[in-house]
Amino acid sequence: MPDSVAVVTGASQGIGRATAIRLARDFTSVVLVARNRSHLEDTAAQVRAAGAGTRVIDLDLSAPAAARTVVDEALAAFGRIDTLVNIAGAVPQIDLFEMTDEQWDAGMALKLHGARRLTIEAWPALVEAKGSVVLMSGNSAIFPKAPYAAVGTINAAIAALAKAFSDRGITDGVQVNSVMPGAVLTGRRRSYLEHWAPAHGMTVEDAISRFPQEAEIERFGQAEEIAELIGFLVSPAARWMTGSTLRMDGGEVKSV
């Protein structure tokens, strides 16, 4: 296998971790980026077990200088960047009329601006490699709700940002797409349900069963399923796909 390097942000847990492990099958090296080093080391062990080399970079991508650091360390370690997968970014789920300016800014700083800055900093290496970029949005971009307005708003911005990058990528030879997952049962979602369920008079397992019924889907998605979709997007089989937004949500969004 020729040398190939993927950079995955948010790789310490959930979809980010699953994606890093999945890409270890197709790339010789995977650079893992997130804030929690101990969790990143756990991911790194699984990436190595899958056959790829790793580089762990623990920093906060909401800091403006962080993107340059990631690119510099990735290039110093492996000499190239073929794929960038922007997954990092937990957005506060707070009601539209209660969320402060500071909370809005914090939500955008990591998921939107962190991904934007990192893609820009990695762009020259991606152009050289004729590489690919994936940005993580979410199906709340299609049906934003007042109780978690920032989630839908920022996810919509991510989808638009990916379209803008893909427009430039047509000229520069860089493939850019975004992914819109639906309700995936990650550790973060389970933690949320552990707080939400007792406040609504039900067990966590009751809440896990109830949500898919209300969303008219069969079940929650799994992080590994989203990782497989991302694996396809950055594979040679999808090379002619750019500027697309791929939704995987178990059929939750019923629109055409």
In which residue ranges do the predicted regions lie?
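Conserved glycine-rich Rossmann-like NAD(P)H-binding loop of the short-chain dehydrogenase/reductase
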Residues: F27-D42
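Short C-terminal tail/terminal secondary-structure segment
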Residues: G14, F143, G231, T242-V256
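Short, small/polar-rich loop/turn modules that mediate ligand/substrate recognition or access, typified
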Residues: I170, Q175, M241-G243
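Conserved glycine-rich cofactor-binding loop
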Residues: V5, S12-Q13
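Substrate-binding pocket helix/loop in short-chain dehydrogenase/reductase
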Residues: D95-L96, Q103-M108, F211
